[in-house]
Structure formats: C-alpha cells, structure tokens
Amino acid sequence: HHLLGCAADLIAGSPDDHRLLFRLIQETHELCGLEFTQLILEPGARWIHISYVPGNLRCQVIDKEKSPN
C-alpha cells in the first residue's frame, strides 16, 4: 500500500506512545466508525502502519506484539 501512496508509518515517540496511539485509532474505529484498510502495531511498537485503500476498507487490525506472525 505504501507504493500506491495509500499507507503511512506513524511514529509517535516512545513504544508506549505507539501503543497508546494504536489503541486510540482502534477505539475510534469501534466507537465512531473510523474506516481504514489496515492498522498494524509493529513488533516492539517501533511504529504504527495505517493504510486507506478506497474500495478496500476492511478495517483489519493486527497487533504484532500479541501475535508476531
């Protein structure tokens, strides 16, 4: 998705900041219907991947800290 200009890796500061931002985006999706294609918390919470591909808004949430595969 990055090569299509439909994704970004967000860097919020510390790993704890990344976890907090990930949860905030996830909760905003659940409570307010925020749409995206993928939301991924990378291992070690180094960054958050988020993508938005029109026509493919599956709202897939992956926490690689909980499940590294």
Model-predicted regions and their roles:
Residues 2-6, 12-69:
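Catalytic cores and adjacent binding grooves of peptidoglycan-active enzymes
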